[in-house]
Design a protein with these regions (language model features):
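Conserved catalytic cores of phosphodiester-cleaving nucleases, focusing on short active-site segments
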Residues: 19, 38-61, 70, 76
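Mid-chain, well-packed structural core segment of small domains
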Residues: 59-90
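Hydrophobic "anchor" residues on beta-strands that sit immediately upstream
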Residues: 25, 48, 91
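Secondary-structure boundary/capping motif
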Residues: 22, 29-30, 44, 110-114
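Short acidic/glycine-enriched loop/turn segments that link adjacent beta-strands
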Residues: 34-36, 104
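Domain-level recognition of nuclease-like catalytic cores that cleave nucleotide substrates
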Residues: 86-116
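Acidic-basic catalytic patches of nuclease active cores, encompassing PD-(D/E)XK
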Residues: 1-29
């Protein structure tokens, strides 16, 4: 596993813990679709939440959420629509969780309905 893969897995774990503490049930991780991978799939209050996790260990490239480009959003939407259709889901949304570790402190920011 590469350094970036380890960082990504660590960030996904931090995001899952954060969401779990806020009442989300993590139903699946790293789900592949023909359009890309969905990092986390969670359920809360009868709604399925597709979660893109962005992780950074420095601020040199800006905050993690800036990594969610227009192209990435298109892939996220296509992946979510594919999964929702395959699983007959009516109520769903796409969130982004940004995880950043600076000076020994981990910050997690949750953006609900980040892609519409």
């Amino acid at each position: 596993m590469t350094h970036n893969q380890r960082v990504g897995k660590w960030g996904e774990e931090q995001a899952a813990l954060y969401l779990g503490q806020r009442g989300y049930n993590i139903a699946a991780r790293n789900v592949r679709t023909p359009y890309g991978e969905i990092d986390l799939i969670a359920d809360k209050d009868g709604q399925t939440v597709f979660v893109e996790v962005k992780t950074r260990l420095s601020d040199s490239a800006g905050p993690p959420e800036t990594g969610v480009t227009g192209r990435k959003q298109s892939h996220m939407m296509a992946s979510a629509e594919y999964y929702a259709q395959e699983h007959d889901l009516e109520h769903w949304r796409i969130d982004v969780v940004a995880v950043q570790r600076l000076a020994g402190q981990t910050d997690v920011v949750h953006f609900e309905n980040a892609v519409a």
